[in-house]
Design a protein with these regions (language model features):
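N-terminal beta1-alpha1 cap of cysteine-dependent amidohydrolase-like domains
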Residues: 1-130
Length: 130
């Protein structure tokens, strides 16, 4: 039976995504190993926190290669920081902007691939990207 893999790298709200997919009737598995990601019909990359910490957690989990491969080959959804990680990775490795980043994380880079919404630029106590 096919399922959706929810990537468990220590920086995402896994149970919220898992419970939502269960409620909607989608088979899903928490993926803490590459084989669960590789055998999935689709992949969700949730994320919370700061980009450098999340990327370090993903690398430490040993799932980076499986996640990158899945993003190229399967339906793939990044949620919150997970989506930002995907866009920044695209900016760095496809567009060739080695300093690609989100303006929230590095407002000095010449290549902000994720910007703040105009009406939220003065809000400092919450995320307001895109």
């Amino acid at each position: 039976m096919s399922y959706i893999a929810i990537v468990d790298y220590g920086a995402g709200n896994l149970m919220s995504v898992h419970n939502t997919l269960d409620y909607l009737g989608y088979e899903n598995k928490i993926a803490a190993s590459a084989d669960v990601i590789e055998n999935a019909a689709g992949v969700i990359l949730p994320g919370v926190g700061a980009f450098p910490d999340a990327m370090a957690a993903l690398e430490h989990s040993g799932l980076t290669e499986a996640v990158l491969k899945a993003a190229k080959e399967k339906p793939f959804l990044g949620i919150c920081l997970g989506m930002q990680m995907m866009v920044i990775e695209f900016g760095r490795n496809v567009l060739g902007y080695s300093d690609a980043n989100s303006v929230e994380m590095d407002n000095k880079t010449a290549h902000n691939v994720i910007d703040l919404m105009e009406d939220q630029k003065n809000i400092t106590n919450m995320g307001g990207t895109m």
